[in-house]
Amino acid sequence: MEFVVDKSRKTVVITAEFAAERDLVWKAYTEPELLDQWWAPKPFSSRTKAMDFREGGRRFYAMVSPEGQESWAVQKYTSITPKTNFKFLNAFADENENPQLPGSDWDLNFSEQNGKTTITTTIYNESRERMEMLMSMGFKEGTEAAYDSLKELLATLSQARGQSNG
């Protein structure tokens, strides 16, 4: 995983490669029952309360600590090009889905070559302070841990897919 922080542009760019076909990786990002299996870094878990994956739709979810403490967030989908790109505004929220602005704009690009999928995620922060707060909360380490869980999930799904095709 490559993780680049550009403070002058208030951006974080994350590039990662996964040993899975793009349609499977896309599903892991766009289907709540799969997304909840990897989005939160262990030992936290992700719990989606509502998700409508379409332009103008949203995902409302909580990161849940091992002690049961919930940290809520909302993602509002602004653009979707199936299996290649989607964008959303991400903001922390309270349990009633009231966003705590400023948020950040996420732009995710999916490409496949030789059965491997590369995801490039560009996160544009509305303020440098928000970006620095995310980094101080362990965003890089959390992303690495979540991607480790995603790799495990994709391996399991790829194996199951191979068995069902055989």
Task: Please identify what each model-predicted range represents.
Residues 89, 95-141:
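Beta-strand/loop substructures that line and gate deep hydrophobic ligand-binding cavities in soluble
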Residues 6-8, 53, 67-71, 98-102, ...:
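A generic structural micro-feature
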Residues 1-45:
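Hydrophobic ligand-binding cavity/cleft-lining segments
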Residues 25, 35, 59, 77, ...:
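Hydrophobic pocket/interface hotspot
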Residues 13, 46, 70-75, 101-106:
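Short, surface-exposed coil-to-beta transition loops
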Residues 47-91:
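Glycine-rich portal/gate segments that line the openings of hydrophobic small-molecule binding cavities
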Residues 126-166:
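A conserved amphipathic terminal alpha-helix motif
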Residues 22-23, 52-54, 78-85, 109-118:
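A short, structured loop/turn motif at beta-sheet edges
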